Regions:
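Iron-sulfur-cluster electron-transfer modules
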Residues: 1-149, 156
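Alpha-helical transmembrane segments of polytopic membrane proteins
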Residues: 67-72, 166-172, 233-238
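Hydrophobic cores of alpha-helical transmembrane segments in multi-pass inner/ER membrane proteins
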Residues: 70-83, 174-179, 240-244
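Juxtamembrane/interface segments at transmembrane-helix termini
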Residues: 80-100, 181-196, 220-228, 244
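Alpha-helical transmembrane segments with an aromatic anchor "belt"
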Residues: 125-131, 160-170, 183-203
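Hydrophobic membrane-spanning alpha-helices of multi-pass integral membrane proteins
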Residues: 137-145, 169-181, 200-219, 236-242
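Membrane-helix exit/interface motif
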Residues: 146-157, 179-188
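Extracellular/periplasmic helix-loop-helix junctions in multi-pass membrane proteins
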Residues: 156-162, 217-240
Length: 244
C-alpha cells in the first residue's frame, strides 16, 4: 500500500519534487534542513522583544504573525494538493463522462471514508491496525485544528493554564503512543504492512514524534514559568513541525 501510494504520488505530482524526494534521501534531508534553518533564522532576526522576568510568548512570537504563517503554509500546501488532485482527475477521468449530480450525491461517501477510512477494515481479519490508525488521525487532526484554526486561543501568552490544553494533551498522548508503537512494529517487522520500510516511512514518523515531543516540552517549560526555555523550545518546535 505504501509503495503504491509513493508511486501514484510521484506520477501525479506536476512539480517533480515527490519523485526526487522518494528516490533520493539526500534531497529529503536537504529540504528538511533547509526549511528548519529558515525557520530558525527567521526567529533569530525577526523575533519580538525577549522578556526574561516572566513568560511572554505573544511578545516574543506575536500570535498574529504565527496565524498568518499558518494560513500561508496551509494555502501553499492546499494549492499543491488540489492541483495534483485535478491532474489525477484529468488523467483518470478524461474519457469518462460522469453526471455532475453524481458528484453531489456521492460527496457524503467521500467525507465518510475520509474521516473513518472504514474500507481499511476490510483488509484482513485484524481490526486493530485500522483502529490505531483511526486514533492516530484523530490526534493529528485535533492538533492541526488547534495550531491552525484555534491558534489565537491555543497559544497562551503567559505561564497560566488554558482549557484548550485538554485537547492538546489528548493529541499529544495519541501521537506519542501510536508513533512509538509504529516504531516498534517497523523494527520487529512482525506485520506484513511494516515488513518493508522506505526512508520516507521512517522520516515521517520521526518528524511526527519529535514535533509532538517538542510541543509538550514547550508547554511544560511555559507552565513552569521559564521564559528563555519557553522561547528556545518554541523555535525548536517550529523548526521540526514546519518541515513535516
Amino acid at each position: 500500500m505504501m509503495a503504491t501510494r509513493r508511486w501514484l504520488t510521484a506520477q501525479y505530482d506536476w512539480t517533480g519534487l515527490a519523485r526526487r524526494f522518494y528516490l533520493s534521501e539526500a534531497w529529503e534531508i536537504g529540504a528538511l534542513i533547509t526549511v528548519a534553518l529558515g525557520i530558525i533564522l527567521l526567529f533569530c532576526f525577526f523575533h519580538g522583544p525577549v522578556i526574561t522576568d516572566r513568560v511572554a510568548v505573544n511578545t516574543f512570537a506575536p500570535v498574529m504573525w504565527i496565524e498568518i504563517g499558518d494560513l500561508a503554509m496551509a494555502a501553499i500546501l492546499s494549492a499543491f494538493l488540489l492541483s495534483n488532485a485535478i491532474r489525477m482527475y484529468r488523467f483518470i477521468m478524461s474519457d469518462i463522462k460522469v453526471p455532475f449530480w453524481l458528484y453531489i450525491t456521492e460527496a457524503r461517501a467521500f467525507v465518510l471514508n475520509f474521516i473513518t477510512q472504514k474500507r481499511w477494515r476490510q483488509c484482513g481479519d485484524d481490526r486493530s491496525r485500522w483502529l490505531k490508525h483511526f486514533i492516530l488521525v484523530s490526534g493529528y487532526l485535533t492538533m492541526m485544528s488547534l495550531v491552525i484554526v484555534f491558534i489565537r486561543w491555543f497559544q497562551v501568552d503567559d505561564s497560566s493554564w488554558h482549557f484548550t490544553s485538554i485537547f492538546g494533551y489528548y493529541a499529544t498522548g495519541v501521537l506519542l503512543v501510536i508513533t512509538v508503537e509504529m516504531f516498534r512494529s517497523r523494527l520487529k517487522k512482525e506485520e506484513s504492512i511494516h515488513r518493508y520500510s522506505e526512508f520516507s516511512d521512517w522520516l515521517f514518523l520521526i518528524l511526527l514524534f519529535f514535533t509532538t515531543l517538542t510541543g509538550i516540552m514547550m508547554h511544560a517549560v511555559r507552565i513552569a514559568g521559564w521564559p528563555m526555555g519557553t522561547y528556545v523550545m518554541y523555535v525548536i518546535h517550529l523548526a521540526v513541525a514546519v518541515p513535516m
